Amino acid sequence: MTKYRAKPLYYCHQAQKFIESKQVKQLSKLEQKSLTYFASRHEFDVYKVLFETSLRSKIELQPKVEIIPPKVTICYPNGKYWKADFMTRIDSKPTMLIEAKGVITKDFMLILSLLELNNQELFNKLWLIFPNSIPQNLLIKRLQQTTMKEKVLTLKQFRKKILTMTTR
């Protein structure tokens, strides 16, 4: 599943610059290994906020999250997994599950439902980060009526909250 109308990009930490997908093929295999893939610019911006804090060494990119456990359904006997954007861990325990969203798609609504149903602990650690404004749909309104209301944020709000959390 890809981002809704997003343009993927690669970031070279060493050169501190973006590299377009078509340029990556021209690089050597060694140079390609030093790149970090981001499905959208917004995803990179969220990563950058995390990277600039004390959470830097605790960030896991594209963690595989179980949304249907194995051997529970006929359709998914091996289970079903979703690759979130980021997870932070302390002592190997997940502390934050972060998804950079531009648009809430029907696929994502289904993923959220399955996560809530089958992995409540991780669902409660979920943060949804939007670029400039938080969409006003039924799903978001419901989330904002729960304890998740403080974890459905714009990028600017997220930056402020993370800096406050990590400088205590």
Question: What are the functions of these language-model segments?
Answer:
Residues 1-168:
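Electrostatic, structured charged patches in enzyme active sites and in nucleic-acid/phosphate-binding
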